[in-house]
Amino acid sequence: MNYLYNISESLKKIFNYFSSITRDCEKKRVLIIGCGFGGSQVAKLLDSNFEVTVVERKQTFFNSIASIRAIVEPELAKKIYIPYDKLLKNGKFIYGTVIEISPTLVKLEDGKELTFDYLVIATGSNSLAPFKAPLEKISGTEIFNYYKDISEQIKQAKSILIVGGGSVGCEVVGEIINKYPIKNKELAKKITIVHSGNKLVSSKTNNKFNNLINESMKKRNVSVILNDRIEIPDDIKQCFINQTSPNFQVSLKTYKTKNGLSIESDFVIWTIGIKLNSESYKTNFSNEINEIGQIKVNQSCQVQGYDNIFAIGDITDFDELKTTYNALSHGNIVAKVIKDLSNGKNKNQLAKHKLLPPIISLSLGPKDGLTQINSNLNFGSFISRILKSNNLLINRFQTHFNNPEPLK
């Protein structure tokens, strides 16, 4: 009997040993909410070694950088909406709307509940500008027609008001004037920018960059009004709250500025900033967000108070420009940190996102642009064309998503 007992105990030990190996070999579950620039980077980097699940409302990635050109070159539309179907070899996508994110699970609109070992919140932001087709436009034809309609309105317009003179507003000017140059009197547009700040593009640009962008606008006969603002109509405010598209139609109106100026325009583009997609996390993480809804994170992109929950992109409270470059950097950091945590690395040894001096590359049409690297290096059209203006990173992100078939 002792002999049989010893065999039984030995078999139990062998079973427990192999069970522990199996548990150790099980892939950790990484749940990523949102698949923009940063979210897609995390998903791609962790796909081989983790059980990756991405939750997305849309079935295509939206290349917002290139979208400003699509409003005058609608044939680009099918290239800036990139299907996700080739991004992951092992992981999976769940297409749906997240209604609640908590420290232990994520709830979807259809009732599904998802758990995780590591959570990456990459919900991003939206804007009022006409560069993004409404969610219900899902086929290539529908998306093309959306941009074609806007391009026709811009073609008809004689005077265009750009409300907001940040980088997006200035890039829009570059695209419109490249398409309708001032020397073509029949098609040329009278363009006015109204900007609430004291200089165009960003408060982080140096004096040389500021002088160059002012000269560029002057050369293009663009009227620039600084330190003033247009009162946003109620219907536009509602669109901003609901994240729906305003009615982009040519219609001659007079707009009053806060300082009392009257501006006549028949087409308006609102580039007044972004709205964070914070609804899903703001309830359960109310102590971890700041007054504008950004999530408080440490240098490893971990949400304040949590080792296994991360935030990246526009929704972080990093004191930096919200750029594609920084979103991709966040993605790289989070992927490395998750790998290190799963390997038992000490939290003091984790990778950290470095807050770098601003890198600003401004496209002003396919052949022109301005670039500032760090706080003291400025470059003109040649470098800007290489970095951004020529292709607006269309090829870069087609490759990033493994060159899927275009939308049909």
Swiss-Prot record:
<dbReference type="Pfam" id="PF07992">
    <property type="entry name" value="Pyr_redox_2"/>
</dbReference>
<comment type="function">
    <text>Putative FAD-dependent oxidoreductase.</text>
</comment>
<keyword id="KW-0274">FAD</keyword>
<keyword id="KW-0285">Flavoprotein</keyword>
<feature type="binding site">
    <location>
        <position position="314"/>
    </location>
    <ligand>
        <name>FAD</name>
    </ligand>
</feature>
<protein>
    <recommendedName>
        <fullName>Apoptosis-inducing factor homolog A</fullName>
        <ecNumber>1.-.-.-</ecNumber>
    </recommendedName>
</protein>
<dbReference type="GO" id="GO:0004174">
    <property type="term" value="F:electron-transferring-flavoprotein dehydrogenase activity"/>
</dbReference>
<comment type="similarity">
    <text>Belongs to the FAD-dependent oxidoreductase family.</text>
</comment>
<dbReference type="GO" id="GO:0005811">
    <property type="term" value="C:lipid droplet"/>
</dbReference>
<dbReference type="GO" id="GO:0050660">
    <property type="term" value="F:flavin adenine dinucleotide binding"/>
</dbReference>
<dbReference type="GO" id="GO:0005737">
    <property type="term" value="C:cytoplasm"/>
</dbReference>
<feature type="binding site">
    <location>
        <position position="69"/>
    </location>
    <ligand>
        <name>FAD</name>
    </ligand>
</feature>
<keyword id="KW-0560">Oxidoreductase</keyword>
<dbReference type="InterPro" id="IPR023753">
    <property type="entry name" value="FAD/NAD-binding_dom"/>
</dbReference>
<feature type="binding site">
    <location>
        <begin position="34"/>
        <end position="38"/>
    </location>
    <ligand>
        <name>FAD</name>
    </ligand>
</feature>
<dbReference type="InterPro" id="IPR036188">
    <property type="entry name" value="FAD/NAD-bd_sf"/>
</dbReference>
